[in-house]
Amino acid sequence: MSKAMSCEPTPWRATVLTLFPEMFPGPLGVSLAGRALATGLWALEVRDIRDSATDKHRSVDDTPAGGGPGMVLRADVLAAAIDAADAGETRPRLVMSPRGRPLTQAKVAELAAGPGPLIVCGRFEGIDQRVIDARDLEEVSIGDYVLSGGEIAALALLDACVRLLPGVMGKQGSALEESFSDGLLEYPQYTRPQLFEERPIPEILTSGDHAKVAAWRRAEAEKLTRARRPDLFATRPQPNRQKPPKNTTDG
């Protein structure tokens, strides 16, 4: 049985294959993503992998070839689930895995600009490598740690994508100024009260000088990135240096 959320037609649709469909939409059903889902800005289809099992016990896993602990998700069952969900479609096919390529903001933007991905959520000891190869699944990781399954990772990926879809965020500028949007971590944020436990808001932020505020934010973002993510700082894109406009009053 598949569970579709939002029956409105939409150009961006995510399909999730999981053994625990009740985990969705989860946090994607509230706040920005939830409102966008309810109004048809995106669609979420959740399909139970067990629906593709062929025996009376709805078995989806078996012991690892060569021995070892745990169980492995079967290639035949998962392939059938993928084929049923993606018949005739061409779109990204992802599997959440700690051995995958790290998810970056650039990858998120790429996925958000496309038709929407199919995401496989693994469980147990892993997935039979043959279905990863045969169905051209791209392994994606959200960090160097191991979760109980791919569902939480899929939720994180989808949340990151959905907020970039047109009409989801109130101000597109918010997305443009966030961490990683230009290869830097985001600058510190402040709001009222003006003084908190003898700690004031930096004076420059209340000066009204937009150029100085922008320069301060850029400098703070660079300082934070250099200290916390030197790897990111070393590979950040360099800002375009625009030439000053030619003085047309000169001869």
Swiss-Prot record:
UniProt-recorded name of the protein: tRNA (guanine-N(1)-)-methyltransferase
EC number: 2.1.1.228
Family from the record: Belongs to the RNA methyltransferase TrmD family.
Annotated positions binding S-adenosyl-L-methionine: G122, I142, G143, D144, Y145, V146, L147
Broadest EC class assigned to this enzyme: transferase
Record's keyword annotation contains S-adenosyl-L-methionine: yes
Region (Disordered): 226-251
GO molecular function ontology, one term from the record: tRNA (guanine(37)-N1)-methyltransferase activity
UniProt keyword Methyltransferase, yes or no: yes
Function: Specifically methylates guanosine-37 in various tRNAs.
GO BP term, pick one: tRNA N1-guanine methylation
Subunit structure: Homodimer.
Record's subcellular location: Cytoplasm
Substrates-to-products reaction catalysed: guanosine(37) in tRNA + S-adenosyl-L-methionine = N(1)-methylguanosine(37) in tRNA + S-adenosyl-L-homocysteine + H(+)
Biased composition (Polar residues): 237-251
GO CC field: cytosol
Keywords, in A-Z order: Cytoplasm, Methyltransferase, S-adenosyl-L-methionine, Transferase, tRNA processing
